[in-house]
Structures are given as C-alpha cells and as structure tokens.
Amino acid sequence: MPTDQELIKIVPSSRQLAYQATEFYAFFHFGMNTYTNREWGDGTETPQIFNPTEFVADQWVSAAQNAGMKGVILTCKHHDGFCLWPTRYTSHSVVSSPWKNGRGDVVWEVSEACRRYGMKFGIYLSPWDRNKPCYGSGKEYDDYYLAQLTELLTGYGDIFSVWLDGACGEGPNGKKQIYDWKRYYECVRKYQPDACICVCGPDIRWCGNEAGDVRKSEWSVVPARTALAESVQERSQQTDDKEFRMRRITSDMEDLGSRRALEGETNLIWYPAEVNTSIRPCLLYTSDAADDLI
C-alpha cells in the first residue's frame, strides 16, 4: 500500500490545476442533429438541412456566463461527421450548407464570443465519423482526423479543453477504427500545451455516466491504469441509448481511490473526475421536447 509520503507527492499539473479552477462550464451540443430531431446522426444527412436562422453566439456565451460558468466546450463535429467549421478536408460541413451562403463558421463565432466575454473555449471532435469513407482504414483515417484536429487547435485561439469521446461504431464501409490515441495526444500537446485532454485522455477523467452522478468520494489520486483510453472507450456509450444516458452510480461500481483500492498499486496519477449532464432529456435540442427541462 502506498505510504502517506508517496500519496502526497501526487499533485496536479499546471494545466490540470487551471482546469479544476474552471469549476463550472457549458457543453454546447449543436449541429446537424439539432435540425433532424435525432440524438445521433448516421452521416447520410444532407448539409442543406443545416440553416440556423436565430444563431447568436454572444447570446449563448453570455447566458453561460450569467449562469456562473467560466468556459464553453462546443461539439465541433459529432458522430455524424458534419463539421461546424469550413474544414479543408471534407465537403460535409457548413461550406455545403445554405447558412450564410456556405461562408459561416460556428466554431469561429463561438470562440470569438468567448474571447469577448472572457470565457475559456474548448472543443469536442468525435473520433467516430459515420460519413467519412476512409473511417476504419487505420492510418488514412487517423491522418484525416489529425488534420481536422490541427485546424481546430491552430485556428481558434487558446483551447482549454479537448474532449475526446470513446464512441467507436461502424463507418459507412461497415468497419470500425482503432484510434491512434498516442498521435492525438501528441497533436494536442504540440499545438495547445496548456489544454487538458479529457475523457479518453490523460488529464481529466470521465465520471462514467451522463446522469450527473458521482461516487460519494470521487478521488483525484487513482491508479495510472485508470487513464488507459482503451478501457475508457470500452465503458463509453456506443449506441444512441436513453438508458445509458440516465445510468447512475451504484454501490457495486469500482472504487477508484480509497486506501483499500490503492493497496498494491505502484503507479499512481492525479486524474480528477469531470461530470457532464444535460438540462434536457437528450443532449441535443429536439422540437418535440423544446420545453422539457430536467
């Protein structure tokens, strides 16, 4: 069992400390699915569907700030593969939409609103892409994903969070991708060294559910094996499953950081938990539940 002296040597990095000081921040789920009344898209949606008429980034960010939040994370691309910025690597993006005649950039507008309001800005870029034909090909798809990740990390100012989802289903070719997490991490460290890599990453741990529920004691000092992206991926949501979204912590779920749990562990890390939950029944807005709040 680790001694007290060994335990107190496990401390947060500067980026982790800054992240934890953020405390409370918004996770904006917005994209193609907002206009299809679906939680998850399948990648076959036409960009012509995407045409926001009342999108005002300043209103979003100011509302978050008025709620006491200190930052914003935006779903720049969800599993359907539709990109909210004019990426150079696919036409399945705002460029092919009627919104602003194909000249709009949701990521830029939200990131700039964050600068104006003194709020931190973070990105969500789903590794799963149900639109891209090369998904499941290995290095070819990883190169594509990294090219888009680089665009976001280099074109939108300081990034405080890179939220890496563990969902890994089939692409349009019926294949699954083995994500090259190591290359993804290296890309983030290269272009945004102060950003925390979250969930399937080494900096911030996911609490394990979308119901906003945590263990009675959610320790930050945990075994290093807890940060293996592959194990996090296995426990992540893999289908559009309402039951998964409402799953809560139960007494038989793994104890991660108590003295008993750390007994016999030789490699410990600082890996604080993050909790995310929706104010609506689903993560995205749907017209049939427009007035429903949890």
Residue ranges and their predicted role:
Residues M1-A290:
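Mature catalytic domains of secreted/periplasmic carbohydrate-active enzymes
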